[in-house]
């Protein structure tokens, strides 16, 4: 999760980027023959596939995260504003995507939308209140019905931490605050208080309600099936937990939640960075209470250029940082294989952030326009990461995030925050989801330039497909042997806010425009 204020400054060690203001001059035909209309001729490259050489079997699900924020509300309950214009189209897009392992995160900038007990129990009374939390949660669960989800109520009630004075929060649920999370020491060192809080949350959504601290029953009527529960978020930044502290908190919460629903599986850590000591400590079963499962771990990656980079150099930075991240993934997978090989991996925040977003907490900041080419670049980066994570045996590749908007990381959004229309980042995810998934065979593919990425798949239905990703803001003409007449689905700067385009190859060449992602179906 991308944090703000003091938390933002801590959480953006590797989460900064300048917006791409590169207006691409490529257009691509959506007719039967796909062409690039550039002044300069495209570079000629060749792709080859060895269908007999299987590299690995994919375990990887392409998916996304949904972060709670006001535009996702059905309407504004506390002040006379019009209902959200994007609520319906956004949840429809989520429903139509049909992805598994979708991550849902109520989090710190909006305490009233993410914390169910904002005040400590006192004098026989509690402050439990789901009236603002339930509508979005219900809409999310309905939109993802029939699919596995990962719930993460990531923000612990602030009063559970020792602070010099109580930490305030806005009366307006739509008012952002970056200062809610403070303190590093729990007021209850036994951790029973925080564990009971999460047990009651789970009981609210799975058992129809719960009994509070004073023995009073609170009825919800909810009996949802929750497949996965992620325990907190970016804990090395939020409350600055050590691996030892987090492991104790994880164990306490897992034990309490399992008492409510023994079928729930758990995701641990959700790290913003990749500190080796966290993985070494947390994945060692000897550091956990007996019987505590480590079903899955999670961590995040956001591409980050330095502030002084020019617009032209940013496209190179993205891919360089992705390569470094993948090297870290290899290292983490080696630790996991050594200490807890049964544990799965969820990279549940994969994204990129513009440099302008880093200024959003400053008074009077106005979000700069984001060019369409930025969304296609981000989509291409995600497609590349998905494929490479599949090679490495990572189970979940989650794109971040469904809705961002001014004050809440607009450059990370997968939709237009004014209309709810999905952008190229969403449509690339849709393209991958509709063509690839767990059980596919990854087979050897090559292309004679480092600037175009190729990976071949034999799907579970036996179809032969080639994923192509253009890493550069220029066109390449890719020769693919025996591809004449093949169907193509693609996302580029001409499709951008529309569903993937469709075409058919008239010959063995495909012109790949700047930052384009294409899937060529070579099954005939």
Which positions does each model-derived feature cover?
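Short, Lys/Arg-enriched N-terminal segments with co-localized hydrophobic residues
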Residues: 1-7
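Bacterial N-terminal signal peptides that target proteins for export
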Residues: 8-17
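Bacterial N-terminal signal peptides
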Residues: 17-27
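Non-catalytic accessory regions flanking glycosidase/transglycosidase catalytic cores in CAZymes
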Residues: 30-231, 237-238, 242-275, 288-293, ...
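Catalytic-core regions of glycoside hydrolase
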Residues: 260, 279-296, 324-339
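Glycoside hydrolase catalytic-domain groove-lining segments
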Residues: 304-361
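Histidine/acidic-residue-rich catalytic or RNA/ligand-binding cores of hydrolases
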Residues: 356-362, 409-414
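Histidine-centered active-site microenvironments of extracellular/periplasmic hydrolases
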Residues: 365-368, 372
């Amino acid at each position: 999760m991308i944090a703000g204020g003091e938390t933002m400054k801590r959480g953006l060690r590797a989460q900064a980027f300048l917006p791409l203001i590169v207006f691409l001059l490529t257009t691509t035909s959506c007719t039967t023959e796909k062409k690039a209309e550039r002044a300069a001729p495209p570079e000629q490259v060749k792709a080859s596939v060895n269908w007999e050489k299987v590299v690995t079997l994919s375990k990887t699900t392409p998916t996304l995260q949904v972060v709670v924020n006001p535009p996702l509300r059905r309407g504004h309950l506390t002040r006379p504003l019009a209902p959200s214009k994007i609520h319906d189209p956004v949840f429809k897009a989520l429903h139509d995507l049909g992805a598994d392992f979708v991550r849902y995160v109520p989090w710190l900038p909006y305490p009233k939308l993410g914390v169910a007990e904002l005040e400590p129990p006192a004098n026989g009374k509690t402050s439990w209140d789901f009236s603002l939390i339930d509508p979005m949660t219900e809409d999310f669960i309905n939109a993802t019905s029939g699919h596995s989800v990962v719930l993460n109520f990531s923000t612990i009630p602030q009063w559970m931490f020792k602070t010099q004075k109580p930490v305030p929060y806005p009366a307006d649920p739509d008012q952002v605050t970056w200062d809610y999370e403070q303190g590093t020491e729990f007021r209850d060192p036994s951790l029973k208080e925080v564990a009971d809080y999460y047990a009651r949350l789970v009981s609210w959504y799975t058992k129809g309600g719960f009994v509070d601290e004073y023995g009073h029953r609170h009825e919800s009527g909810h009996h949802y099936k929750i497949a996965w529960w992620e325990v907190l978020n970016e804990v090395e930044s939020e409350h600055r937990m050590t691996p030892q502290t987090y492991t104790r908190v994880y164990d306490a919460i897992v034990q309490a939640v399992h008492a409510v629903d023994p079928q729930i599986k758990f995701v641990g850590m959700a790290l913003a960075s990749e500190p080796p000591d966290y993985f070494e400590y947390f994945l060692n079963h000897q550091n956990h209470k007996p019987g505590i499962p480590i079903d899955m771990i999670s961590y995040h990656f956001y591409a980050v250029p330095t502030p002084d980079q020019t617009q032209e150099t940013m496209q190179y930075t993205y891919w360089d940082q992705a390569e470094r991240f993948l090297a870290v993934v290899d290292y983490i997978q080696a630790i996991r294989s050594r200490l807890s090989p049964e544990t799965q991996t969820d990279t549940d925040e994969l994204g990129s952030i513009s440099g302008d977003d880093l200024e959003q907490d400053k008074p009077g900041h106005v979000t700069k326009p984001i060019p369409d080419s930025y969304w296609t670049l981000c989509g291409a980066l995600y497609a590349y990461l998905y494929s490479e994570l599949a090679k490495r045996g990572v189970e979940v590749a989650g794109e971040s995030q469904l809705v961002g908007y001014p004050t809440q990381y607009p450059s990370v959004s997968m939709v237009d925050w004014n209309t709810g229309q999905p952008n190229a980042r969403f449509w690339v995810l849709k393209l991958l989801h509709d063509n690839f998934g767990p059980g596919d065979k990854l087979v050897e593919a090559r292309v004679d330039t480092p600037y175009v990425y190729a990976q071949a798949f034999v799907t579970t239905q036996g179809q032969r497909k080639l994923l192509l990703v253009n890493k550069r803001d220029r066109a390449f003409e890719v020769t693919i042997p025996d591809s004449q007449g093949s169907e193509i689905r693609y996302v580029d700067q001409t499709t951008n806010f529309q569903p993937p385009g469709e075409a058919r190859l008239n010959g063995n060449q495909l012109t790949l425009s700047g930052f384009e992602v294409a899937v060529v179906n070579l099954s005939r």
